[in-house]
Amino acid sequence: MTKDKLTDAMHLRRREVLGGLAATGLATAAGFGPAKAQSTRTGVVRVWGEPGPYGGVAVAAMNEWAQKNAPGLKFEIESIPWDGVYVKLMTDLAARRPPSLISVESPIAMQLMAEGLLTPVDDLVEKIGRNRLVDGVKWEYWGAWKGQQFIIPAHHQPHLLLVRMDIAKELGLSDPDAWDWNDLLNAAKTISQKKPDMAGFCMALGRNLCTDYHFAALLHSAGGRMFDAANRFEVAFDSPQTVEALTFVKELQPFMPKGAVEYSFLQVVDAHVTGRTAMSFYWGRTLGRAAEEAKPIFEATEAFNHARHPTTKRRNNWNDFQGWCIPAQNNPFIDEVRQALVYQQTNKDWLIKYCHSLMPNVAPTYRDIADAPELQNHPFYKSKPRTVDTYFKTSLAHSSSTANEMLQGVNPLAGIVHGRSVLAQTVQKVVIDNMKPQDAAKWGAKELSDIRRENIRLLG
């Protein structure tokens, strides 16, 4: 979001804000109840967020709170890639200068929570509204540990199957929403054969997070897991389900771009937006970029829940339940951050601006926002209503992630797994080294066992 747009956004009429809050019964929680004494604190409140305009929108809302309640404070966003958060936080804690608020993806949030580095936020849940969550989710999906909530929802963001429907119709392919893995494989093969200048399908295969996330969805759809949450996170990776998921990736590889073994987030988006693939796994950013750079591709692309596994019928995505967490140590602004966060989380106008800042990538987490008529005041609701609904709502029934595999239990080891690229390396053993999937599964299981043994303290 540009500086001008943020400035304009900060000049909301107070009557509009109050009207929106009154409609959801949240005026008191947002700080419009009995007057409170202003904070006399001064300084800069450091807020970490991953690259993206939505962090800036949230901070603009917090600065609106500060203007009224803590005029000596200024909230400032610092963009930090999520996989750099843990190392930088350890460095900043050692220097006694941590950020005061962090928006981060769920795997690292779960690790910080289990490490005891965060402030509990159970009382904020009550102020924000415990019963506001959209259907199909629970507060603990964002982060609860040993009976306490540590993470406040920012958004959820699933990766889905993106399909060029113009190509699908031209080649007589069936409805992608009805596909299973065999149908997806056949569609990728058909496109590659009949469109020699275009890959049939694209996912990341490089040694990076994107590959981790893409493969995890296939692993979970097959019924496989890294760890068994019900058995104190014993390693469960050396399984027929892991072998099946790895085999499927190997079968898809001939119909992917030749450089896919190096691909990460950017390259997958590039391949789709530039017309070098007809299908891809990705989050909503692809559509946002296509709308700006490649209108015909944007108009032709629709998002679908993932192809079903032929046996389990599961169609899991990797859904990041991204949230806000408050570092507990050497944080001089805990009280002010808590108040500002409640203000942002209970202000309908700001929450809608947050979602609109990167459509349809950051999905609303509260029912009153998801159902608000104002949310539909965005061009994508006219041009891509079914796709937006899939990202925002129907994907939730198929949510999974490495931080909460099959939603069976928060995993404090996931961030460490991603830090070592265990899943991506396992995939590369198959697609680059031509290792048998069975042997690759055993290799990955050993790596996961090492992680569990070295970090057993996190399991309590």
Language model features by range: what are they?
Residues M1-L12, A23-G25:
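N-terminal secretory signal peptides
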Residues T119-D135, D177, L205, A222-E244, ...:
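Short, solvent-exposed loop/beta-turn-alpha elements that line the ligand-binding surface or hinge
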Residues K68-G136, K169-S174, A271, G275-M279, ...:
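Extracytoplasmic "Venus flytrap"/periplasmic binding protein-like
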Residues R41-G52, L73-E78, L101:
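Short, well-ordered beta-strand elements
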Residues G31, W145-A154, H159, D183-E234, ...:
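Extracytoplasmic/periplasmic solute-binding protein
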Residues S106-L160, N182, T211-H214, A300-H306, ...:
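Hinge/lid segment of periplasmic solute-binding proteins
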Residues R285-I297, P310-S421, L459-G460:
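C-terminal lobe and pocket-closing loops
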Residues A187-T190, A230-V261, E302, H306:
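Glycine-centered hinge/linker elements that transmit conformational signals in sensory
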